[in-house]
């Protein structure tokens, strides 16, 4: 457990180190907010095979870390500061520190790069657009692919804010999540554990009750750093996927908006392409890290 200082007190966050490699240290940032590291266990086989040093990590508020209840903690700047404290604790620096963020973890990774890129060697943003309003617009596009009667029932439940209604999940799972979150017929145990352990209080406060866009009153709803991506000079990999909840064309555009970007497209993947288009995803991530490490990235 790593001690973390915050404006409302001191807490501890859970991390687990794999391997020892002074040249490559990768910190994995999970999504949610307030999911867990568990769904990112898929990196273990691939990164260990390459000899990378990497860290699974539960952000503050997540299941394996402390879960304070002060709502002042749940904002981007505070999470960015937490990542910087974790970096120091794992003795990573601009010569070896790679951040890989998926979904909300991608928001955190981009925001970290904007504030602390002097400490960063490589940035990997998996399946996260740089604008929450644009993401919400794309969710509208995808939601219209659902059967009209299904969408009508989903919207009716949302209008009543009856999110605890089991019917809400019953509708979203086969009609949206199985298409756009993870397309494997059977969801991996690691992903199911992560879902079971989500801190729904933090998740709902920051993003809303489901993966179908964001609530207009969620703390992340107006988040948009697209016009700041040009400030990021760290070598960056943006990952998009055909069936993702995030527009793959936006992910490609983001790779051109940063100063040194590369785009990885997963033609069979969704939001968790690390699982459902695994070979393409992992091969691309590993190549990026090796290219940056050997100074052959361009």
Swiss-Prot record:
It comes from the Bacteria. Residues 26-277 form the AB hydrolase-1 domain. GO terms for biological process: proteolysis. Gene3D superfamilies: alpha/beta hydrolase. Pfam families: Abhydrolase_1. Maximum activity at 42 degrees Celsius. Stable at temperatures up to 44 degrees Celsius, showing 50% of activity after incubation at this temperature for 15 minutes (at pH 8.0). Optimum pH 8.0. The active site is at residues 103, 244, 271. SUPFAM superfamilies: alpha/beta-Hydrolases. It catalyses: Release of N-terminal proline from a peptide. Keywords: Aminopeptidase, Hydrolase, Protease. Its EC number is 3.4.11.5. GO terms for molecular function: aminopeptidase activity. It is an enzyme of class 3 (hydrolase). PANTHER family: MONOACYLGLYCEROL LIPASE. Belongs to the peptidase S33 family. Monomer. NCBIfam families: pro_imino_pep_2. Releases the N-terminal proline from various substrates. Cleaves specifically Pro-betaNA and small peptides containing proline at the amino terminal. No activity against hydroxyproline-betaNA. This is Proline iminopeptidase.
């Amino acid at each position: 457990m790593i001690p973390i200082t915050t404006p409302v007190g001191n807490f501890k966050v859970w991390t687990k180190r794999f391997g020892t490699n002074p040249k490559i240290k990768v910190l994995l940032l999970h999504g949610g907010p307030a999911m867990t590291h568990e769904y990112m266990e898929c990196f273990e086989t691939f990164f260990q095979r390459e000899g990378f040093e990497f860290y699974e990590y539960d952000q503050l508020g997540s299941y394996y870390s402390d879960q304070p209840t002060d709502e002042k903690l749940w904002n981007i700047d505070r999470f960015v500061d937490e990542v910087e404290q974790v970096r120091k604790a794992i003795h990573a620096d601009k010569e070896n520190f790679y951040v890989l963020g998926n979904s909300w973890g991608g928001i955190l990774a981009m925001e970290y790069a904007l504030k602390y890129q002097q400490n960063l060697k490589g940035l990997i943003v998996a399946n996260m657009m740089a604008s929450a309003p644009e993401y919400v617009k794309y969710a509208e596009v995808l939601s219209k692919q659902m059967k009209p009667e299904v969408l009508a029932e989903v919207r009716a439940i949302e209008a009543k804010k009856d999110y605890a209604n089991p019917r809400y999940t019953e509708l979203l799972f086969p009609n949206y999540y199985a298409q756009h979150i993870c397309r494997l017929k059977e969801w991996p145990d690691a992903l199911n554990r992560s879902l079971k352990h989500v801190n729904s209080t933090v998740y709902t406060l920051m993003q809303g009750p489901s993966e179908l866009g964001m609530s207009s009153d969620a703390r992340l709803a107006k988040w948009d750093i697209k016009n700041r991506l040009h400030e990021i000079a760290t070598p960056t990999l943006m990952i998009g996927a055909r069936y993702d909840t995030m527009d793959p064309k936006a992910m490609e555009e983001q790779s051109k908006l940063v100063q040194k970007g590369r785009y990885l497209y997963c033609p069979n993947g969704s939001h968790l392409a690390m699982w459902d288009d695994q070979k393409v995803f992992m091969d691309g991530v590993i190549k990026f890290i090796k290219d940056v490490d050997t100074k052959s990235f361009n």
